[in-house]
From Swiss-Prot:
Family under the similarity heading: Belongs to the universal ribosomal protein uS14 family.
Primary role: Component of the mitochondrial ribosome (mitoribosome), a dedicated translation machinery responsible for the synthesis of mitochondrial genome-encoded proteins, including at least some of the essential transmembrane subunits of the mitochondrial respiratory chain. The mitoribosomes are attached to the mitochondrial inner membrane and translation products are cotranslationally integrated into the membrane.
Organism: Saccharomyces cerevisiae (strain ATCC 204508 / S288c) (Baker's yeast)
Superkingdom as given in the UniProt entry: Eukaryota
Subcellular location(s) of the protein: Mitochondrion
GO molecular function: structural constituent of ribosome
Species lineage: Eukaryota, Fungi, Dikarya, Ascomycota, Saccharomycotina
Gene3D superfamilies: 1.10.287.1480
Gene: MRP2
Protein name: Small ribosomal subunit protein uS14m
């Protein structure tokens, strides 16, 4: 399923959705689809044993790729709220959602600290 905002059709993520989550999801999908192409072009561009012309062409192709195909564009976001700050990567939750879910007992192996 696609929408008007993105140049390529994308699937919608499950759960909470806002514009930032849609953008991040689109970038993740495009990075996943083009990862092999980008890695091969980087290998060619950085291989000193190859001819200079071939390396230069690979570098120009890399520079021509859109920004949304780069891994640096991907941001860790909370799957419950969409927050991008203080996301615990093991649970993919922001600190507030982590606290709420831990207190409810929704996270296995996590309990309130007592000392």
């Amino acid at each position: 399923m696609g929408n008007f905002r993105f140049p390529i059709k994308t699937k919608l993520p499950p759960g909470f959705i806002n514009a930032r989550i849609l953008r991040d999801n689109f970038k993740r999908q495009q990075f996943k689809e083009n990862e092999i192409l980008v890695k091969s072009l980087k290998f060619i561009a950085r291989n000193m044993n190859l001819p200079t012309k071939l390396r230069l062409e690979a570098q120009l192709k890399l520079n021509a790729l859109p920004n949304y195909m780069r891994s640096t564009q991907i941001k860790n976001r909370c799957v419950d709220s969409g927050h991008a700050r203080f996301v615990l990567s093991d649970f993919r939750l922001c600190r507030y959602q982590f606290r709420e879910n831990a207190l409810k007992g929704n996270l296995p192996g996590v309990k309130k600290g007592i000392w």
